[in-house]
Amino acid sequence: KPGLKILFYGKPGTGKSQTAAILGNELKSQVYRIDLSQVVSKYIGETEKNLSKVFDIAEYKNWILFFDEGDALFGKRTALNSSNDRYANQEVAYLLQRIEDFAGIIILSTNLKDNIDTAFLRRFHIITEFVLPDIKQRGQIWLKLLSEIKSCKVQLSKTEYEEISKTELSGGAITNVVNYSLLKANYYKKPIKIEIVKEGIIRELRKENRLTSL
């Protein structure tokens, strides 16, 4: 079949969207992120119409189609218990056909591969898992992001870098912590120290409903 179908799966913040953007940049193709709230409709036939527009334009402009967190469209199909279920499965059948016929690149991202219907899984040429960075990789991410800051001083010792690297966070979460630390340090006209960074880490852990002591 024509085209290339790619599935990225893994926890939030592990780089799925960033990798899609890098791929587009390397191939010099625009990555079109599909807003599922604008595509999926409760009205019969509307979802197919919206998908048709997206695929037609993407084929004409040679876009890379990126279904970010596309579980609403690519999720497991329901049993035929009602007329609504039958229409939902018609949407799936239509989407399967458009994917089969699409000559370009399609990327789907999801947090859980098991959420994706097997009918779609069979059609992906590449399935890649994005995992959380290990402690060494986290240390490298912390060092890279904090060393790039120019608007204020960063005052963390080697021991403190090692300490913050012990907390399991995604690359996206570490980026959020660094941005929080930078904003707070600039607001108070102070250097970034371990206390501010720990505040940012706690904020991220609360978002994920994870409790820890630092």
Regions found by a protein language model. Give the residues of each.
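C-terminal alpha-helical "lid" subdomain
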Residues: 123, 135-136, 140-214
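Walker A/P-loop NTP-binding motif of AAA+ ATPase domains
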Residues: 1-163
